[in-house]
From Swiss-Prot:
Coiled coil segments of this chain: none
Pfam families per UniProt: Myb_DNA-binding
Name used for this protein in its record: Transcription factor MYB3
CDD domains xref list: SANT (cd00167)
Taxonomic source organism: Crocosmia x crocosmiiflora (Montbretia)
Locations listed in the record: Nucleus
SMART domains documented for this protein: SANT
Length: 259
């Protein structure tokens, strides 16, 4: 420990310089707790310390004062220091006032030792906290539009008729009513490839009398069609008696309905 003489009034007093001891820290804390942190110039002599007033003040503010944090500065505190330094510059006392538990001397030393070597800006800190907003991860406006715009399939009238009529069970299928809803061009000979055909609805063409479709009346021999549907569905029944019972009532029964 280096000793140095200092004149206090008319007397020369030896002053210790260097590392503080635990005994000196205890004396300083006891005196400040009892008398407050005022009049630092007269404090060393009253507290029994061979230190100058400035050394006592810095020791108290930077190390012994209640509420001082110990340990390394966290990453969040570093980010806050960088943001405040970009706004305030080297005004360490003001910066320390906005970071609880850290002193201006500690923040200044940490900045000069570690943070000043980094070329981080506020934009870099924002990208660091929100990696999803990085330009490399952002979608282009075209991709966003493609994802947000639903794909709609335009169906013509014929497709809608297929969807609504082919799902009906056989007893509810009214062929005459269905054919009356179709455009006339769909039943006329020489129709183009985009028009409907009867086999699109599960109706076998070979089972229907084609002579029944004429351009003058468009009548359909649907009784023959229903008879053919009845015998073709006979194989769906596990019990032939069940099938014959359905025929006795003159209706098309499904295996599920008969059970």
């Amino acid at each position: 420990m280096v000793k140095r003489s200092q004149r206090v009034g008319k007397k020369a007093v030896e002053v210790n310089r260097g590392t503080w001891t635990a005994e000196e820290d205890e004396k300083l804390m006891n005196y400040v707790s009892a008398h407050g942190d005022k009049k630092w110039r007269m404090l060393p002599a009253k507290a029994g310390l061979k230190r100058c007033g400035k050394s006592c003040r810095l020791r108290w503010l930077n190390y012994l004062r209640p509420g001082i944090k110990r340990g390394n500065i966290s990453e969040d505190e570093e980010d806050l220091i960088i943001r405040l330094h970009n706004l305030l510059g080297n005004r360490w006392s003001i910066i320390a006032g906005r970071i609880p538990g850290r002193t201006d001397n500690e923040i200044k030393n940490h900045w000069n030792t570690h943070l000043s070597k980094r070329s981080l800006t506020i934009d870099d800190l924002n990208n660091k906290q929100n990696p999803g907003l990085d330009n490399r991860d952002m979608l282009s406006p075209t991709k966003i539009t493609q994802r947000s715009t639903p794909t709609h399939t335009n169906k013509n009238t014929n497709d809608e008729l297929i969807d609504s009529w082919t799902d009906l069970p056989a007893p509810d299928f009214d062929l005459e009513q269905f054919l009356s809803l179709l455009p006339m061009s769909d039943l006329c000979p020489g129709s183009n490839g985009n028009d409907l055909e009867l086999n699109d609805f599960g109706i076998p063409i070979n089972d229907i009398n084609q002579d029944s479709f004429r351009s003058d009346d468009y009548n359909v021999n649907y009784q023959e069609f229903l008879d053919s549907q009845v015998w073709s569905r006979a194989f769906e029944f596990d019990d032939i008696d069940q099938f014959l019972d359905c025929q006795a009532y003159g209706s098309l029964c499904s295996p599920i309905a008969g059970q």
